[in-house]
């Protein structure tokens, strides 16, 4: 598995759990995650931006489906 896919899985898993636990500010969650990934230096800026977009998109979908299931 490449590094982008690995980070994607880790971030979606951890951030989804935080959403389940009551955090609701997706922008803040994604920004914190972006900063953590940037600090590792393992991905290029372009990879980080693509990763961030994908994570944000999927978290927003998760949040909508989670709210609908309540």
Where are the regions a protein language model picked out?
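Amphipathic alpha-helical membrane/lipid-surface binding segments
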Residues: 4-70
